[in-house]
Amino acid sequence: LDDWHSGVIHLRGPSVMSGYFNLPEESSHALDEDGWLNTGDIGYQVDGVLTITGRKKDLIIIHGRNIWPQDLEHIAEAEPEVRSGDAVSFSIPDHEGEEMCVLLVQCRETDPQKRNNLVRRLSALMRLEMSLDCFVELVPPRSLPKTSSGKLSRAKARLDFIATHEDDNLNAVTEEFRLRVASA
């Protein structure tokens, strides 16, 4: 690719694995027939320097627009009530088959009015900073899932969100989101 153009990063060389042990199907997805490893990372290059921008599986695509979840999380974490590492963002399919952005924020505030104000403010910031309507939900402290290395797990948070709201009917969540957007 030309400088400044993003793409999926592939590697090949003597130190690159030849496959996953006893997992031929996973190996065939990760490695092509010429031995190139698909890292799952997206990046760009400028003057021979590679910059990794994020994981392909974490990328949020809304109406054909690529949005990095860490950009949304950074905006949320800039608010005084939100600590660094207390926000996670991902997308889910809505009842019309479109992708809907979700932002989960660990919140220590107990006052209902202050919590509601924070949700409204974060929603407005996503619209202002990113031109994006985002379903914001406050969750209890220390409730967001983490990986074995201690980082927030977007994939697990997404699965937990879907599982939690399936009983409530995920369609009701997307309808609530549409009503919030309409009243904003």
PLM feature spans:
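Conserved ATP-binding loop and adjacent catalytic segment of the adenylate-forming AMP-binding
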Residues: 2-7, 16-18, 28, 32-34
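Short, acidic, Ser/Thr-enriched surface-loop or helix-capping motifs
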Residues: 4, 45, 146-147
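A structural motif
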Residues: 9-11
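AMP-binding/adenylate-forming catalytic core of the ANL superfamily
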Residues: 13, 18-19, 29, 40-130
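Short, small/polar residue-rich loop motifs at catalytic or cofactor-binding pockets
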Residues: 37-39, 139
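Conserved C-terminal "lid"/linker of ANL adenylate-forming enzymes
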Residues: 90-91, 102-103, 123-183
